[in-house]
């Protein structure tokens, strides 16, 4: 088991890693719209936040030897399901392979963000 860390994605804000690689798979922790350069949530809209989340996931996957194209499954958390269409528009531009997915509305997310996504992906050989 290997713990993944990259400066190109936000550092964990709790007692967890950015990702773990084991048995040819990478499991990313949930990513929120923290800008890794500033350490702050700067994006305000669901579109902007989803864009930042996807960039963060891409950076973690690349650090783990994987990519967005290798994603098998995502779990998506939205603060408001009325954001579903706008979220899907950005999400679909990043996850073009259409991985399996769960998407649920939740009452609240860390730092009061609008979206959080975690992934499972194959590690490139």
Which role does the model predict for each range below?
Residues 1-125:
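Short, polar/acidic, helix-capping and beta-turn segments at strand->helix junctions
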């Amino acid at each position: 088991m290997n713990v993944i860390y990259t400066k190109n994605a936000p550092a964990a804000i709790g007692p967890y890693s950015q990702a773990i690689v084991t048995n040819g798979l990478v499991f990313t922790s949930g990513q929120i719209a923290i800008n890794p350069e500033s350490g702050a949530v700067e994006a305000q809209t669901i579109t902007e936040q989803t864009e930042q989340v996807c960039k963060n996931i891409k950076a973690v996957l690349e650090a783990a030897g994987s990519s967005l194209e290798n994603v098998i499954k995502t779990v998506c958390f939205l603060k408001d399901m009325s954001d579903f269409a706008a979220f899907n528009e950005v999400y679909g531009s990043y996850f073009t392979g259409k991985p399996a997915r769960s998407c649920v509305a939740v009452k609240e997310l860390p730092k009061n963000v609008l979206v959080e996504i975690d992934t499972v992906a194959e590690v490139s050989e």
